């Protein structure tokens, strides 16, 4: 049997079960959340590294990992991570991955097979291209993308449960070693994510439609509000708030995402532009023959698209019955409503909250199975709740 020193780098065995150490490069929202999640899952050997000493220190303070800069020069030189997670911006993720692949390359004399390197950037074509162009050992690189986030950024916004029940896309490529893919997959599963596999082109086309274009549309609509009179904004309901919610996202990050995934985004926007031009042309002459039919068709096409989005637990969309319960804006009132619904044996399929403009009351829109709708309305009303069907 060959000794580790006699084996080539590609022959050194790699463990597809996470044991650590793990190095997280980039201690923002995603990086720090991964650190918190791994440590909560029992992997204590986690280190965080960031170009910002403050961000790195905060990540350590919240428990996301040990600050890499606290290691001595000798310890850093000998450092041999099993996994490196690159949580860098999209425009630099590939270059950082390439550096990590070279820095933590195999050391056959020590039996070290080298680090598996993954990134969590929201685009995947460019990082892979950058790694391949660098000449680094791409067999240990696995692109991945956890589809989770918040409007807030930075390590202070990190949550260990951020990835629970959220999709995590893993992008294999032709030269990657299967055991490296298995390791990254096991990490995603350990963090509670639901793993999906796509190639890098499929990934970028998909996220252009389901994430990047929605961000663009939300920002474009929200920009119309800049000169809107305050009296008009005070009347805004949940429809506008839902549509512009993600417009509060970090502009610096999204500039990088748009630039890195420009072509798939543009291809989707061409279709949106065609439909928008069609709508404008119809509304410019709304009494013309066929105008109302065209408007109805546009709306129906939207209905058809929405109906294809999976429902609860990934199943086919279900038609739920809805009711609205008026809830006083006082401590404990909403909790009492939910507790009483539970006491009545009803299962909530969905819950949406909306605040009433100018009144200390909220509206809880409750979705339930149609078979219990009438009984729940009756029972809640009997308990003194103000229910609107």
Named regions from a protein language model:
Residues 53-54, 122, 175:
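Helix N-cap at the beta1-alpha1 junction of Rossmann-like dinucleotide-binding domains, i.e.
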């Amino acid at each position: 049997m060959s000794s580790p020193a006699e084996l080539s780098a590609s022959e050194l065995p790699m463990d597809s079960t996470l044991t650590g150490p793990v190095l997280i490069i980039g201690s923002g929202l995603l990086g720090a959340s991964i650190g918190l999640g791994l440590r909560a899952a029992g992997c204590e050997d986690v280190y965080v590294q960031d170009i910002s000493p403050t961000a790195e220190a905060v990540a350590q303070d919240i428990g996301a990992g040990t600050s890499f800069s606290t290691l001595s020069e000798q310890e850093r030189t000998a450092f041999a991570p099993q996994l490196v997670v690159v949580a860098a911006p999209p425009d630099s993720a590939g270059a950082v991955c390439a550096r990590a692949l070279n820095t933590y390359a195999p050391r056959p004399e020590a039996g070290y097979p080298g680090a598996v390197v993954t990134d969590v950037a929201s685009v995947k074509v460019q990082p892979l291209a950058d790694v391949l162009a660098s000449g680094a050992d791409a067999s240990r690189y696995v692109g991945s993308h956890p589809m989770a986030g918040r409007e807030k950024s930075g390590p202070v916004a990190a949550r260990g449960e951020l990835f629970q029940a959220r999709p995590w896309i893993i992008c294999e490529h032709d030269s990657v070693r299967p055991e490296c893919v298995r390791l990254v997959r096991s990490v995603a599963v350990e963090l509670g994510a639901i793993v999906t596999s796509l190639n890098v082109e499929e990934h970028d086309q998909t996220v252009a439609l389901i994430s990047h274009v929605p961000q663009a549309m939300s920002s474009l609509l929200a920009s119309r509000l800049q000169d809107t009179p305050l009296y008009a904004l005070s009347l805004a309901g949940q429809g506008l708030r839902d549509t512009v919610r993600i417009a509060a996202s970090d502009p610096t990050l999204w500039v990088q995402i748009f630039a890195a995934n420009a072509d798939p985004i543009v291809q989707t926007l061409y279709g949106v532009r065609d439909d928008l031009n069609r709508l404008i042309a119809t509304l410019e002459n709304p009494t013309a023959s066929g105008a109302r039919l065209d408007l109805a068709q546009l709306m129906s096409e939207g209905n058809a698209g929405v109906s294809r989005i999976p429902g609860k637990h990934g199943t086919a969309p279900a038609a739920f019955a809805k009711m609205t319960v008026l809830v006083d804006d006082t401590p404990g009132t909403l909790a009492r409503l939910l507790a009483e619904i539970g006491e009545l044996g009803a299962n909530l399929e969905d819950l949406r909250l909306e605040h009433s403009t100018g009144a200390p009351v909220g509206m809880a829109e409750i979705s339930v199975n149609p078979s219990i709708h009438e009984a729940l309305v009756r029972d809640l009303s009997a308990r003194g709740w103000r229910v609107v069907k």
